[in-house]
Amino acid sequence: SMLAGMGPDIVETPGPSYVKEYQEAGMLENLDSYAAEFGWKDKLIPWAYSSGVFDGSLYAIPKTHESMVMLYNKTLFEENGWKVPTTLEELEDVAGKIKAKGMDVYTYGSSGWQPTHEHLVGIYLNNYAGPQAVYEAITGEREWTDPVFVEALELLKKHMVDEGWWSGSLENYYAIGWDDFHAQFATRGAAMMTIGTWTFQATSLGIGQS
């Protein structure tokens, strides 16, 4: 409908790169007048506001501030005396205990939405290399070939490919989708689940407080 010039008044996209494509194609209205009228620049976090600015004008505003998180089955951890990991050493230790129980460490999958690959890459880059190093790479102050990034991705390969932390194997990760990995987490097929904050409402409805 966008290509046909019949798109809706408000369009939702996965992020700024998609907005830029629409803006370059002349499909979006400049929002500067609305921003001035309603004071959006004062109400939004500066980086959030600037994420929708292209060629000096505002074309989009973010709906949410999102991040990747790890959910764990609290009851399952308590039953087995497992400590919620706060370091890499603790994470690898509890992962071994989870696998010894015949469960998967994490559940997650990319069937139907391949960008989940970058979710996991982002988790490892930010938690191993650190957000400052990632920022420096994004701004051109550091090379992506820096050893700290190489080590982060080698660790992801170790956990995901070599040890099958996500849904038991890389092949399973590729094969399962939203309903599958939520069901696996809810039925104790996996002790933990990686997920984005944008799914919290749907995730809570599917899993429940228990």
Feature-to-residue mapping (PLM):
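Short helix-initiation/N-cap motifs at beta->coil->alpha
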Residues: 1, 16-17, 88-93, 170-183
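Extracytoplasmic "Venus flytrap"/periplasmic binding protein-like
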Residues: 1-44, 75-86, 183-184, 191-192, ...
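Loop/turn elements at helix/coil->beta-strand transitions in domains of secreted/extracellular proteins
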Residues: 5-9, 57-58, 99-106, 162-165, ...
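Hinge/lid segment of periplasmic solute-binding proteins
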Residues: 14-68, 83, 92, 98, ...
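Solvent-exposed loop/turn segments at secondary-structure junctions
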Residues: 15-19, 66-69, 76-77, 111-115, ...
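Short, solvent-exposed loop/beta-turn-alpha elements that line the ligand-binding surface or hinge
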Residues: 30-44, 127-151, 158, 205-209
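Extracytoplasmic/periplasmic solute-binding protein
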Residues: 54-63, 68, 92-142, 190
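Glycine-centered hinge/linker elements that transmit conformational signals in sensory
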Residues: 95-97, 139-173
